[in-house]
Amino acid sequence: MGVSRNATTHEWTQRSMTLRIEWFEGSREELSDLFALADDSAAAVATYRALGRVLVALDGATVIGHLQLVGGDGQDVAEVKSLAVREDRQGAGVGRLLVEHAARACREEHRSTLLVATAAADTRVLRFYQLLGFRLLRVERDAFTPETGYPEVAVDGIPLRDRVWLSLGLNGETSVSRPSRGGEE
């Protein structure tokens, strides 16, 4: 496994599991299942999987979640490009911890904004990000269509079509660090 042992490691003990959040340095192929869980389009994943940096949540030696952070090279804005937690570990705060760690890293790099895009139909994920302090920024219509490489699906009966962009201001904001009230990834 390609987890960096030299990276800053944060450990949390929660619900009888000890989690470590670390920067991943291995082959992104090792994380294919998580990338597929985060995005319904294998073609889309292929275009961005190699970009940026990836944080992983580990329970022992097992990767249970990831967050891909893109942007850099002097840019003021970073983007959460991909975030997923194994289905059997969702709801335990793993996604929140990954976002908190990414936001902290962005603050240390003096970035002002953290962006994320998600499906407008996925109200559970929209709630998750808003509980962390992200705010609605804009809607990208027809981003998830067969023409853009996505299957025709519905989330909780809502057709998957539009992408919603959310932003989190990082200058002096601490919303991402506050305890979540449910809806955790």
List the predicted regions and their residue ranges.
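Conserved N-terminal entry element of GNAT/NAT acetyltransferase domains
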Residues: 2-26, 164, 170-181, 185
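Acetyl-CoA-dependent GNAT
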Residues: 19-88, 96-100, 140, 169
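Short, P/G- and charge-enriched loop/turn segments at secondary-structure junctions
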Residues: 42-44, 150-157
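Active-site acidic-Proline motif in GNAT/NAT acetyltransferases
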Residues: 86-88, 92, 120-121
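A conserved short alpha-helix in the GNAT/GCN5 acetyltransferase fold that borders
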Residues: 90, 99-107, 130
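Conserved GNAT acetyl-CoA-binding A-motif
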Residues: 106-118
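Conserved beta-strand-loop-alpha-helix junction that forms the acyl-donor binding cleft
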Residues: 116-126, 137, 141-147
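Conserved active-site tyrosine of GNAT-family acetyltransferases
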Residues: 128-129, 134
